């Protein structure tokens, strides 16, 4: 509907330019927003205030001329001026009902694919291998997954890239420790304890540390024995990650892994090409790039270190190689990096160097989708009681156990298998939704009690809202698709729910554009709340007549499908019963 109103305004502006009311050459970004008070219309635009100065007119006077020039459209009943010059639009409820009927018949719930399809790289998760995933990996994994799902739904060709840390000192450490302490494959599968023991040895013995670094050099040189051990460690670690991804219902597979090691052969080319471009400068023995736009507090240029003084490469080198691959080989139009916002400067520098060096050979927008930290109740980074890092598997296991206790209290008669399945869906969903519902760039405090609450903007509340819709149709022995008749919006609660359901497409477009799943969470929470009000105030099964009953069933069916589709795009499973 917003697009329709923008088009109507644009046609009116074109007419006013032709009439000489507006000067030629104006290209305003026409903004249309939902109104809060529906008595003053459904949508509002500030276009008259934006153009009053170039038009040389008062905003309200220009608004009158814009309204007079608006083409007639069945979807709008009237437009009127409000306040200093806003133009409020009232939508035709019959036209709205027609759009919702069409959405109910559509496999995509009325959501159109957005513009021309583009290839989008989504860089997400990216744990360092050789040890188990911890809570710090949660946000990149699930936010990236949610945005990737939305972009795919909107028509993008999404290429997921799990840029795992599968190269470097930690592998030399593990190999050196394995040489000292030969163990079986079964024992090696407990990678966390093995890593901890190797790290302790590395920190305590300089001789061991030297051996570990020497093995890294051999690994980088292609030593067959080192490569075989590295492959074993990597495979074990990736299998651990894959179990987490499956538990989280995240669309990441082994085929999406494109780790640091994948770019090894191109690192020397990155260095040589930067050198050929005259961009490399030696500083304290290291090879660096200095860009004028990045300076420290004293106004001195900040270095982007490409090669360390000891000849080693850094993250920037690998990230530059990844940019070349994503632009030159994948031919991506857009690359989204879901990495902690504390890395903002790093990515600003990498992107700037890549552009200046000509590494972006295929036009590609690069965006760092930074995120805040997940903290404990004390507002500090989430830790175990003894100050250690919380394993992600432990967190997810506890979430399921807590959910199991809650579900069993509410439904003690359920079979054990059903209890466990509901606990899994609710527990995992609660952890994911608590994160996804927060603004991506915000820090937040992890709280099991809040996220498992059946009231408020939580996964349990939304899952329950969906089961309420499903329950209506279960009583009738019908599916969402088996409802006849047409939607007829008479009661205010029907109209409010209908107007919200019609916004699904624009909400998804906003998520895809900004990389902010919390917008979708807020929307689904509002849909659930409006459905609850509709359900309580507009009898469905005991409606006044059959036409009203079918209309309300259709509205309920669309609410159910919207909730289910929205939760699926967030990576949350739904339940038919709770």
From Swiss-Prot:
Catalysed reactions, as listed in the record: tRNA(Arg) + L-arginine + ATP = L-arginyl-tRNA(Arg) + AMP + diphosphate
Enzyme class, spelled out: ligase
Short sequence motif named 'HIGH' region, residue ranges: 127-137
Molecular functions per Gene Ontology: arginine-tRNA ligase activity; ATP binding
Pfam families per UniProt: Arg_tRNA_synt_N, DALR_1, tRNA-synt_1d
Keywords: Aminoacyl-tRNA synthetase, ATP-binding, Cytoplasm, Ligase, Nucleotide-binding, Protein biosynthesis
CDD domains linked to this entry: Anticodon_Ia_Arg, ArgRS_core
Localisation: Cytoplasm
One CC-aspect GO term: cytoplasm
Domain of life: Bacteria
Principal location: cytoplasm
EC number of this enzyme: 6.1.1.19
Gene3D superfamilies: Arginyl tRNA synthetase N-terminal domain (3.30.1360.70), HUPs (3.40.50.620), Isoleucyl-tRNA Synthetase, Domain 1 (1.10.730.10)
Range of residues in the leader sequence: none
GO biological process: arginyl-tRNA aminoacylation
Family that this chain belongs to: Belongs to the class-I aminoacyl-tRNA synthetase family.
Subunit-level organization: Monomer.
Name recorded for this polypeptide: Arginine--tRNA ligase
Source organism of this protein record: Pseudomonas fluorescens (strain SBW25)
Lineage, highest ranks first: Bacteria, Pseudomonadati, Pseudomonadota, Gammaproteobacteria, Pseudomonadales
């Amino acid at each position: 509907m917003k697009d329709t109103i923008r088009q109507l305004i644009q046609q009116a502006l074109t007419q006013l330019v032709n009439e000489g009311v507006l000067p030629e050459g104006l290209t305003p970004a026409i903004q249309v927003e939902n109104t809060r008070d529906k008595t003053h219309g459904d949508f509002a635009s500030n276009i008259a205030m934006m153009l009053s100065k170039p038009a040389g007119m008062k905003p309200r006077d220009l608004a009158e001329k814009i309204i007079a020039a608006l083409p007639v459209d069945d979807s709008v009943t009237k437009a009127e001026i409000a306040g200093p010059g806003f133009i409020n639009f009232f939508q035709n409820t019959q036209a709205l009902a027609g759009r919702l009927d069409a959405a109910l018949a559509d496999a995509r719930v009325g959501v159109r694919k957005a513009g021309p399809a583009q290839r989008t790289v989504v860089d997400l998760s990216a744990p360092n291998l050789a040890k188990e995933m911890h809570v710090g990996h949660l946000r990149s994994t699930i936010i990236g997954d949610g945005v990737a799902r939305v972009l795919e739904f909107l028509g993008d060709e999404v290429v997921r890239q799990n840029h795992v840390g599968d190269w470097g000192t930690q592998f030399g450490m593990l190999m050196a420790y394995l040489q000292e302490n030969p163990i079986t494959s079964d024992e090696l599968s407990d990678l966390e304890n093995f890593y901890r023991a190797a790290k302790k040895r590395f920190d305590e013995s300089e001789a061991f540390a030297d051996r570990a670094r020497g093995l890294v050099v051999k690994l980088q040189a292609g030593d067959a024995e080192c490569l075989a051990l590295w492959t074993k460690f990597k495979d074990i670690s990736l299998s651990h990650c894959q179990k987490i991804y499956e538990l989280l219902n995240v669309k990441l597979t082994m085929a999406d892994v494109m780790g640091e090691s994948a770019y090894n052969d191109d690192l020397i080319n990155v260095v040589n090409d930067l050198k050929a471009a005259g961009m490399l400068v030696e500083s304290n023995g290291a090879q660096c790039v200095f860009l004028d736009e990045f300076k420290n507090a004293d106004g001195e240029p900040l270095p982007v270190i490409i090669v360390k003084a000891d000849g080693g490469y850094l993250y920037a080198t690998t990230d530059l190689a990844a940019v070349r691959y994503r632009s030159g080989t994948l031919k991506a139009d857009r690359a989204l990096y879901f990495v902690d916002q504390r890395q903002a400067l790093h990515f600003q520098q990498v992107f700037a160097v890549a552009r200046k060096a000509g590494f972006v050979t295929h036009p590609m927008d690069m965006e760092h989708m930074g995120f805040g930290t997940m903290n404990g109740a004390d507002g500090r980074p989430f830790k175990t009681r003894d100050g250690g890092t919380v394993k992600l598997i432990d967190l997810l296991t506890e979430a399921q156990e807590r959910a199991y206790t809650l579900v069993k209290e509410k439904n003690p008669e359920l079979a054990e298998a059903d209890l466990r399945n509901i606990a899994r869906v609710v527990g995992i969903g609660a952890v994911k939704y608590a994160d996804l519902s927060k603004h991506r760039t915000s820090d937040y405090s992890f709280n099991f009690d809040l996220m498992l609450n059946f009231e408020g903007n939580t996964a349990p509340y939304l899952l329950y809202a969906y089961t309420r819709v499903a329950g209506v149709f279960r009583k009738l022995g019908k599916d969402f698709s088996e409802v006849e008749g047409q939607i007829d919006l008479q009661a205010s609660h029907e109209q409010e729910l209908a107007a919200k359901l019609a916004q699904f497409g624009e909400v998804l477009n906003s998520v895809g554009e900004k990389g902010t799943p919390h917008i979708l969470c807020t929307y689904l929470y509002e849909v659930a709340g409006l459905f609850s009000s509709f359900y309580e105030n507009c009898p469905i099964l005991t409606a006044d007549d059959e036409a009203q009953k079918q209309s309300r069933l259709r509205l309920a069916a669309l609410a159910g499908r919207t909730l289910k589709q929205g939760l699926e795009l967030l990576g949350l499973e739904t339940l038919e019963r709770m």
